[in-house]
Amino acid sequence: MKRVLFRPQAARDLKRLPNRDQDQVEDAIERFAQTGFGDAKMLAGEGRQLRLRVGDWRVRFVYEKPDIIRILHIRNRREAYR
């Protein structure tokens, strides 16, 4: 299992989500950290950033080490790629 760390902005983003969406995003992050499975893909032109798709939400993250995931921010899909 990988350790998940949140940047301060990502923690604020998560707290601002509606409760139902917040639970879905937390579950998806935890599932990805445990299994490596989820709708995640590398972002072109963004260095080593990846995104995890959770409904209408996009979780951007990087692997800091093979066993550490750093969540950068959580945005609605309309705003995620601007």
Predicted regions and their residues:
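A short, surface-exposed loop/turn module that caps and links secondary-structure elements
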Residues: 27-53, 81
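Enriched for short, Lys/Arg-rich terminal
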Residues: 1-23, 37-38, 53-57, 62-82
